[in-house]
Amino acid sequence: MPLLVEGRRVRLPQSAGDLVRAHPPLEERARLLRGQSVQQVGPQGLLYVQQRELAVTSPKDGSISILGSDDATTCHIVVLRHTGNGATCLTHCDGTDTKAEVPLIMNSIKSFSDHAQCGRLEVHLVGGFSDDRQLSQKLTHQLLSEFDRQEDDIHLVTLCVTELNDREENENHFPVIYGIAVNIKTAEIYRASFQDRGPEEQLRAARTLAGGPMISIYDAETEQLRIGPYSWTPFPHVDFWLHQDDKQILENLSTSPLAEPPHFVEHIRSTLMFLKKHPSPAHTLFSGNKALLYKKNEDGLWEKISSPGS
């Protein structure tokens, strides 16, 4: 069954702006979200999701109470939630393979959902802006279309994307919202930024920059974050890129050079350095081809734990 708003099937294709104008509650929700002040989210109880990662958990989780992601310019952050059991998935989509990613998101929630119980699937889409290359617009269209193709009824509750998440300054366009968090217990979604993007922030970012596909990073049953084992081919021309100035890196390695947050270039440089240092991660980072496992400690912070059999 299709994507629904207020119980009615969404007419596609249409722009995000036209869609919310046809459904005033959607427009009002986007307006309220844009109007929020940004909350700084601390590391306690947080599971931070990087680009091309997804994480899913439920209110039964004793370790994780918040899922979040930020630094989305043309990317979209997607939250899918089952209202019956509270199972919640957050993912940071960049349009690499939306057709494959939406079924992954759906299956992650279905692995929790007892379909005999009451409740419905609700989706929230946030991110993107009116960028020159129309990458945000394309991703919005892809996500709406793919959710509409799924077998289950999916209720579109929040749509704050592309032109609905756009602000203009000196004739340049920027996103209003770069990041969001969702409270697993209360289902509240709010504007957020994060100081702590770990664990293993560089390793996870390197996998994405090296072209890795969307992956699930968290096992809610064991309450463990699982990283790897990853493999990638050596990053092409890594020395060339490391010798370029900030302007060249911004213009060539960003989908939206004018709209990136201030730390973007520093983040790309450190990720390139990591890729140069670890051209074959299977040998240097994943001893015995074992995943790196992390679990929250009593203070709500990530702590590395031993892999089984190590």
Curated annotation (Swiss-Prot):
Main location class: cytoplasm
Free-text activity regulation comment from the record: Inhibited by micromolar concentrations of copper and zinc ions.
Leader sequence residues: none
GO BP annotations listed: adult locomotory behavior; memory; ubiquitin-dependent protein catabolic process
Site description Essential for catalytic activity, residues in chain: C75
Role this protein plays: N-terminal asparagine deamidase that mediates deamidation of N-terminal asparagine residues to aspartate. Required for the ubiquitin-dependent turnover of intracellular proteins that initiate with Met-Asn. These proteins are acetylated on the retained initiator methionine and can subsequently be modified by the removal of N-acetyl methionine by acylaminoacid hydrolase (AAH). Conversion of the resulting N-terminal asparagine to aspartate by NTAN1/PNAD renders the protein susceptible to arginylation, polyubiquitination and degradation as specified by the N-end rule.
Name of the protein this chain belongs to: Protein N-terminal asparagine amidohydrolase
